[in-house]
Amino acid sequence: MSNIDKERAIAAALAQIEKSYGKGSVMKLGQRPNVDIEAISTGSLGLDIALGIGGVPKGRIIEIFGPESSGKTTLTLHLIAESQKKGGTCAFIDAEHALDPAYAKKLGVNIDELIISQPDTGEQALEIADTLIRSGGIDMIIIDSVAALVPKSEIEGEMGDAQMASQARLMSQALRKLTASINRTNCITVFINQIRMKIGVMFGSPETTTGGNALKFYASVRIDIRRIGSIKDKEEVIGSQTKVKVVKNKVSPPFKTADFDIMYGSGISKEGEIIDLGVKLEIIEKSGSWFSYNKIRIGQGRENVKQYLKEHPQISNEIEKIIREKSSAITNINLDQTEE
């Protein structure tokens, strides 16, 4: 078959597919109107940089997992707030029945516009999620959490009944159904997950996430979040030092990490990240306990500098912009070196 005949055959096949399944069902990748992946900020400057595209990708499945009280829900509430700032409509499937509206409001979530559901069973939760995603009007949906998606058979059964892998089967079936709708509607779907210990593991990490392996495969981004220390004001604990690791990333190089502070009552400390990343990238100068920007001293001690940046948002925004530009340039250089 000559090249002309091949092209005619392909064109005829594409025309037949489009006639059967609609325009846009098949095309050459270069013809796609939006090749670049859009992203929504996580609310953490360091994590946005670690993810490589400035946030979590639209139209993808995201898994956020970690131990108890590590900041999983806080991070997802920041995601909702950032999406709402850009005019997005968000939904929260609260399978754990533990969402605190007052805390969400403090983190910048518009609770009047947030769609919330507190389902009774795992099937109900995932059906609600499917209906909302298929509507095409939802920009982000949070499912909190996979561990709380209890199958109907388990709820209706006796307390001691063995329900072997029923949750894993439920998740596998749901993700097969959801994944095409998520991509088509460009909806960010975030699953919060918990950690369990595998029994009898001799080598490697005994930690695993709940709900089987399906979510590990379907997720484009998997974020491991851990509390690594406390932030104290004299004797009072006022926050947590948090470390996140991007353990899977289909849209950028994985295994990058970010550290940030989660302050009780106000969430991720943007100012703390600006100081740490500013010093690391030599945008902010540190001499002893003094910090300087553009040769002007902006404070002594990290907490005082944080307060200064809160009171001077124009300087804070200026430093943040430089950090994002510098980090983007460094990422591009690293990618070019990898390709060589």
From Swiss-Prot:
One GO biological process term: DNA recombination
Single annotated GO MF: single-stranded DNA binding
Keywords on record: ATP-binding, Cytoplasm, DNA damage, DNA recombination, DNA repair, DNA-binding, Nucleotide-binding, SOS response
Recorded superkingdom: Bacteria
Localization per Swiss-Prot or TrEMBL: Cytoplasm
An annotated GO cellular component: cytosol
Location, primary (coarse class): cytoplasm
PANTHER family tied to this protein: MITOCHONDRIAL DNA REPAIR PROTEIN RECA HOMOLOG-RELATED, RECA
HAMAP family: RecA
Reported function: Can catalyze the hydrolysis of ATP in the presence of single-stranded DNA, the ATP-dependent uptake of single-stranded DNA by duplex DNA, and the ATP-dependent hybridization of homologous single-stranded DNAs. It interacts with LexA causing its activation and leading to its autocatalytic cleavage.
Official protein name in the record: Protein RecA
Annotated organism of origin: Rickettsia prowazekii (strain Madrid E)
